[in-house]
């Protein structure tokens, strides 16, 4: 969690973890407030190393606690991320930590034998003082940061209208929803990796692929691929179609998951793009 001690974020995370523990899991909670996390300095050492098939680590490994936490995180079967919402999106501490994940890109580390193969499950909890209107990019930003470590997000929850520290304790339904997060994570862990699926509300969000609530008008992508409408999180492409009851839904095109960011194959296309556009610079 990136929340304060005994904050709404930490309280909801504890409730979810308690359910996991009750169902037989070994759990550990890490609060980023207890650690020193430095901003990425943009040295590109990790990306240059990966382009040559070498693991260089992060140039800041010895400067802060990021690696210490990642050594634990990448050795887990599941992680539940919980963060407060500031200015529509997750807190800067959460983003600062997660934006350093490229140096620990799990598909690459697995490929070169630096870490053991692991099918990771993930879930998200965002907490804010208002409705979705003032948390509109919270879960979406959180989910986008989980791609690098190949987390299969099976559920996510936005706790709304709890602006005061610990206020979430006044709402039994919010506590119950956090506990449901823990239950769904355990259900996913007890399911074969190839059969794991979204376990939250099936109608949650606009995107049927990642369940984000964020779409945008499509623009030409690398090598000319274009869709009328795109999911801003997973990159699914398609269009809006009117349903028989007069509402709208996002329908993914036949080739709409060619560059699905939730898959290692889809992210691989992006790596190819960066390599080509960077050229010999």
Question: What do these predicted ranges mean?
Answer:
Residues 161-164:
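Active-site rim beta-loop-alpha module in soluble metabolic enzymes
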């Amino acid at each position: 969690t990136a929340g304060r001690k005994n904050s709404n974020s930490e309280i909801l995370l504890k409730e979810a973890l308690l359910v996991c523990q009750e169902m037989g899991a070994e759990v550990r909670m890490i609060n980023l407030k207890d650690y020193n996390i430095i901003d990425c300095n943009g040295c590109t050492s990790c990306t240059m190393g990966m382009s040559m098939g070498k693991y260089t680590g992060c140039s800041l490994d010895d400067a802060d606690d990021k690696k210490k936490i990642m050594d634990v995180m990448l050795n887990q079967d599941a992680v539940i991320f919980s963060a407060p919402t500031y200015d529509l999106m997750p807190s800067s501490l959460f983003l600062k930590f997660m934006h350093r994940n490229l140096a620990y890109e799990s598909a690459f580390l697995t490929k070169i034998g630096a870490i053991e193969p692991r099918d990771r499950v993930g879930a998200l909890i965002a907490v804010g003082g208002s409705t979705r209107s003032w948390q509109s990019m919270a879960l979406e930003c959180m989910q986008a940061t989980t791609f690098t470590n190949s987390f299969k997000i099976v559920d996510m929850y936005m706790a709304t209208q709890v602006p005061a520290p610990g206020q979430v304790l006044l709402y039994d339904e919010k506590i119950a929803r956090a506990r449901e997060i823990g239950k769904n994570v355990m259900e996913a862990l007890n399911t074969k990796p190839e059969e794991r699926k979204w376990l939250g509300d099936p109608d949650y969000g606009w995107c049927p692929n990642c369940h984000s609530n964020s779409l945008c008008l499509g623009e030409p992508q690398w090598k000319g691929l274009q869709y009328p409408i795109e999911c801003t999180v997973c990159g699914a492409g398609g269009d809006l179609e009117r349903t028989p009851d007069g509402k709208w839904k996002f329908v993914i095109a036949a080739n709409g998951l060619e560059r699905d960011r939730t898959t290692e194959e889809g992210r691989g296309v992006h790596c190819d793009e960066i390599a080509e556009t960077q050229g010999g610079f």
